């Protein structure tokens, strides 16, 4: 396999971006009371857990976290596979009294977030929903935007943003690849 075109964020830059997002969440929500973070499979989950830990550290309150599988809510399910892999959805708290922050690694077309919103609403009716992403690469196909962004990264549609996290990949980094180099 070839190498990435560029390393967009190093481990230290990922850490700083997550810390900044945590501070922005606190500022916008006037604290961390009644917040809950829900990570979208796969890399949104460790990012949500990291943000919850940072928010707890900064505000001294426990922030519940959950995980959301959007597989059955995708609008391209028939194109993905005959046997889609269904992963666990786990939201061990009542959504009704919470402001939920959905967390994902990359925001691209907006279709994943649309599916996540549908899945979340099927679980309950939160007070409000916000979106935090590590990377926003543009190319939206739906009217969706992130409330909190670690890095805005304009890309070509022939490029791929690969987020690597210590929990899933053994290292923290964000890389930019040419799509053809990944085939």
UniProtKB/Swiss-Prot annotation:
Entry keyword annotation includes Methyltransferase: no
GO biological process assignments: regulation of DNA-templated transcription
Catalyzed reaction equations: UMP + diphosphate = 5-phospho-alpha-D-ribose 1-diphosphate + uracil
One Gene Ontology molecular-function label: uracil phosphoribosyltransferase activity
E.C. designation(s): 2.4.2.9
Domain of life according to the entry: Bacteria
Motif PRPP-binding: chain residues: 100-112
CDD domains: PRTases_typeI
Keywords annotated in UniProt: Glycosyltransferase, Transcription, Transcription regulation, Transferase
Top EC class for this record: transferase
HAMAP family for this protein: PyrR
Family: Belongs to the purine/pyrimidine phosphoribosyltransferase family. PyrR subfamily.
The protein's role, per its UniProt record: Regulates the transcription of the pyrimidine nucleotide (pyr) operon in response to exogenous pyrimidines.
This protein's name: Bifunctional protein PyrR
Organism field: Deinococcus deserti (strain DSM 17065 / CIP 109153 / LMG 22923 / VCD115)
Organism ancestry: Bacteria, Thermotogati, Deinococcota, Deinococci, Deinococcales
Gene assigned in the entry: pyrR
């Amino acid at each position: 396999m070839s190498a990435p075109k560029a390393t967009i964020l190093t481990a230290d830059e990922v850490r700083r971006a997550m810390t900044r997002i945590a501070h922005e969440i606190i500022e916008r929500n006037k604290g961390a009371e009644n917040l809950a973070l829900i990570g979208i499979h796969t890399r949104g989950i460790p990012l949500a857990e990291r943000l919850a830990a940072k928010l707890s550290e900064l505000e001294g309150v426990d922030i519940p976290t959950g995980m959301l599988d959007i597989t059955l809510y995708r609008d391209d399910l028939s194109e993905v596979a005959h046997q889609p892999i269904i992963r666990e959805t786990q939201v061990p708290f009542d959504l009704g009294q919470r402001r939920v922050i959905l967390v994902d690694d990359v925001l691209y077309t907006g279709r994943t977030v649309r599916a996540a919103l549908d899945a979340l609403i099927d679980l309950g009716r939160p007070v409000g929903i916000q979106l935090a992403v590590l990377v926003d690469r543009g190319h939206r196909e739906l009217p969706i935007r992130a409330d909190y962004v670690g890095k805005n990264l304009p890309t070509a549609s022939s490029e791929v943003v690969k987020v690597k996290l210590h929990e899933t990949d053994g290292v923290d980094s964000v890389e930019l690849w040419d799509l053809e180099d990944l085939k």
